[in-house]
Amino acid sequence: MSILDTIVEQKKREVAMLPARVIAAGDLRDAMLERGERRDFIAALCQPGSRSAAVPAAGSGGVPPRETSPTGTAGKPAGGTPAPHPPIALIAEVKKASPSAGVICKDFDPVRIAREYEAAGASCLSVLTDEKFFQGSLDYLRQIRAAVRLPLLRKDFIIDERQILEAIEWGADAILLIVAILSDEQLKKFHSLATEAGLAALVEVHDEAELERAMKISPLLIGVNNRNLKTFKVDLVTTERLAARLKSRAGFQPALDRQDARPTLLVAESGIHTRTDVERLKQCGAKAVLVGESLMRGGDIGTKVRELIG
């Protein structure tokens, strides 16, 4: 049994202890309305460097805005010259430990770390909520939300719709959906429930087969995990290979069955340690990078963030 299988089995035991109930889209929308604020995760990725703004709770999960210059002309600054290549967005991870690395940060203060990430220019935050394997907590979402203005991703192993409700109630603006642990039916259902409620969904893949499954639901966010969750081997070529596959099949253009002009955004995850790594991933089409361990081990978080994204 792989570590991923072990984690999922533990997650099934945890989910079995949650109050039994059927979760409908209306329940999630009501929970979001009761919370009263949604931070636009996807818009924040489309505007790296800008400050997050709250939007009405009844939103649609984030609509990437049209990129404009100070003159208001998309893609061109004053004078009509081409705009420079847009900066890459950083999803900075609040992460104490992992099965592969053990304890990463002994002096772990989630609020302090989140504030340092925000001050250094992160676009969004990823918050580990798995307790047994990553020493995370749902309460970290609540604490961090009260301390910063950035949109928050609940980083966990979602296998049940009740976990989506938890994400809303504890303060997340986005959830992670790992294709490797979900059936096609679950993936479609959870993605639909989340987006209808106003949560962004980062749909994570690791290989071509998972990418093809993911693209059937026309996600706004595709995360490519460079770490094989079964072997824990890391290789940035994974993002390059799947980015090429995305370009060949869709060219990052809107899916034909989606009734709007929103493209799929590529997020590269894991194994990202240097500015060279970031530039390499940016060149192959990544709009954002999700980085945790190298930032948590970097000593001065602010300095490390600036080294990565400039």
At which residue positions do the language-model features occur?
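Conserved, mostly hydrophobic/aromatic
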Residues: 7, 92, 117, 167, ...
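Catalytic cores of alpha/beta
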Residues: 159-170, 208-217, 272-289
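Glycine-rich phosphate-binding active-site loops on the catalytic face of alpha/beta enzymes
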Residues: 166-182, 224-231, 286-304
